[in-house]
């Protein structure tokens, strides 16, 4: 068997973190384990060493396994560019754009791709921990599903369903999810996990017993709410406006550095700012109103899957004028990827938006033109005198650069990347702030521009260690709060035979049996 699908009752139920925790727990036992998500819909992505693009959650899960990310861990990635269209990335590379309806026509071929990719991983590893997408009970999508029960059926995977108790109604979520599945799908569901519980778990005992009596399936653990888990959010639902990112430690000096990040409608790789939030004395907030910039020291304009449309949103909300005024007062602004493109004088886009040429914010003397081919690479260079690396995922490229514009990054051959003009900086590089020495120099520069002389950048923050600590915490939570013996049984033997089948999904008016054997 050696593989397990972790599904969830909803988006943001905790599938990604539970999968990462199970990966970490298994890896710490010495097992060769790999992550897998057949289809991910996310604008949070990374570039792999093999030159492709996958969802960030699978890169984090790979790190939990002690592996470099690979396109095989996420063979299909959907990157929404609007409410109706998404870019399709197959095995790391762009494979056209689709609408929800046109995508259905590709599902059969893609199912073959994801199953064969999973088969290869299963042959090479002791265990493969698969993550579902959204909910397996989206009955309008089941006929062409390749990410949840469609994958489980095709690959013979036992399924563990995660429910988020913090939303309320977790027992209805779990029971209803199971009951909506058809009989063959229900037979693969071996149990449940309750996630994000606050308080004394003994309060749940009667509910757990009743759920087992109703479904014939146990809850294999109750994971507590963990305030210290905040890195590498998979879902855009996690980027709440006005909420502080992470759990910032007190400043090393006498002043905080306050960072505002416009929460763009099509924000991508918002996790770039998490490295800033890991620093003592740095308070990072996502914002949607210009008034929220009035007390900010630094504005970070993040990436976007729809640069021109999100630039229009900045104008519509008044944030564009507020960002210009912020920089006009000598206060620091930095743009990353799409945010960097917005800071330039002109953007010509016949690829993402098709609108042609539009004016940027005019804060960096550059012009950007979008190309059909997507740039995917993991470059290195120097910035603020420190060695740096990062990764690039973009269609827009500079086609004109002002003679006097300095680069933020200097490439090995001496070429300038990005831009730096007064208190305004920009780069196409994601992951730049994960370089510890550069991040400290950048924060010191930003504090100087903002007149925050009392802010002192910590000299001992290692973002890699912070991330590793988060993964170890996930592994600890799984080991302490889940029935790991039961998870091993699912991995090795699949879902038990004879599990009850519930109406209406299984038909009939009473619980049926999935086959011989006892409950």
Curated annotation (Swiss-Prot):
Keywords on this record? Cobalamin biosynthesis, Glutamine amidotransferase
Q: Which Pfam families match?
A: CbiA, GATase_3
Please, which domain of life does this record's source organism belong to?
Bacteria
Ranges for domain GATase cobBQ-type: 256-438
The protein's annotated pathway: Cofactor biosynthesis; adenosylcobalamin biosynthesis
Catalytic residues?
337 (nucleophile), 430
Entry's SUPFAM superfamilies?
A: Class I glutamine amidotransferase-like (SSF52317), P-loop containing nucleoside triphosphate hydrolases (SSF52540)
Q: Which Gene3D superfamilies did the record assign?
A: 3.40.50.880, P-loop containing nucleotide triphosphate hydrolases
InterPro entries in alphabetical order: Class_I_gatase-like (IPR029062), CobQ/CobB/MinD/ParA_Nub-bd_dom (IPR002586), CobQ_GATase1 (IPR033949), CobQ_N (IPR047045), CobQ_synth (IPR004459), GATase_3 (IPR011698), P-loop_NTPase (IPR027417)
> Biological process GO terms, please?
cobalamin biosynthetic process
GO molecular function (one)? catalytic activity
Query: What family is reported?
Result: Belongs to the CobB/CobQ family. CobQ subfamily.
Q: Which NCBIfam families match?
A: cobQ (TIGR00313), PRK00784.1 (NF001989)
Function of this protein?
A: Catalyzes amidations at positions B, D, E, and G on adenosylcobyrinic A,C-diamide. NH(2) groups are provided by glutamine, and one molecule of ATP is hydrogenolyzed for each amidation.
Name of the protein described by the UniProt record: Cobyric acid synthase
Q: Which organism is it from?
A: Saccharopolyspora erythraea (strain ATCC 11635 / DSM 40517 / JCM 4748 / NBRC 13426 / NCIMB 8594 / NRRL 2338)
Q: Point out the gene that encodes the protein.
A: cobQ
